[in-house]
Amino acid sequence: MKIDVIISADYIDSESLKGKIAVVIDMLRATSVITTALYNGAKKVIPVVSVEEAFEKANELKSLGEEVLLGGERKALKIDGFDFSNSPLEYKREIVEGKNVIMSTTNGTRALNLCNKADKVIVASVLNGQAVAKYLENEEKEIVFVNSGTNGEFSSDDFMCAGYIISEICKNKEAELTDIAKTAKYVCESSEGIEEFIKDAKHYNILKNLGLEEDLKYCSTKNLIDLVFEFKNGEIKTVESGVKVTI
């Protein structure tokens, strides 16, 4: 098994992902939202790039009699006309269960759609990090951790999340790590904790200044969720792998 890391969505080369498994991370907050919404019973999550596409998809599904919720952000704030912002704490079971969630965010949904040439696209966060690691131990193809980043820039929060999952994989599986994957693993293993490490991150402080401390605490919590989610044919659903994941 070989493991690599891409540092932001701007560095994604869709063609180079052919034959590989992409693991997309937007820890603060898109993949944490996706993980939470599906864990709480959402039928599926549909990540789209533009706001216009989100409304078009919502109208299409509603015309078929489907229940739809719109979630996402621009500049970390709720989009006009959407049901939810990009706060995972809003996606409660009593609200999302059995419904389709259409999401559009600045970084995460863009990164997901840029990975469409990969053989498989897995959605990861700190919340389900160990479950993702256990799932990936059964794969032999090259794994590329795709950090969504912040507006095309490197984000230490996504890097830390990738390092955490890589570290978990390496506990049980021998892997060949690229230099950047080794660095992510080392940074994670050398830190005092995920939230402690990312407190100086630019995006962390943008969210903190907006009063979203509870989101930050939640998104930094390891292994609340023991499920794995795959982006396939434009939709994210729970993986039906037959692999038993024990947390």
From Swiss-Prot:
Output the Gene Ontology terms for molecular function. Answer: 2-phosphosulfolactate phosphatase activity; magnesium ion binding; sulfopyruvate decarboxylase activity
Cofactor(s) listed in the protein's UniProt record: Mg(2+)
Which reaction is recorded as catalysed by this protein? Answer: (2R)-O-phospho-3-sulfolactate + H2O = (2R)-3-sulfolactate + phosphate
Gene giving rise to this polypeptide: comB
**Does Magnesium show up as a keyword for this record?**
yes
Keywords for this protein: Hydrolase, Magnesium
Q: Kind of enzyme, top EC level?
A: hydrolase
Protein name according to UniProt: Probable 2-phosphosulfolactate phosphatase
Which family is annotated?
Answer: Belongs to the ComB family.
Its EC number is: 3.1.3.71
This protein's species is: Clostridium perfringens (strain 13 / Type A)
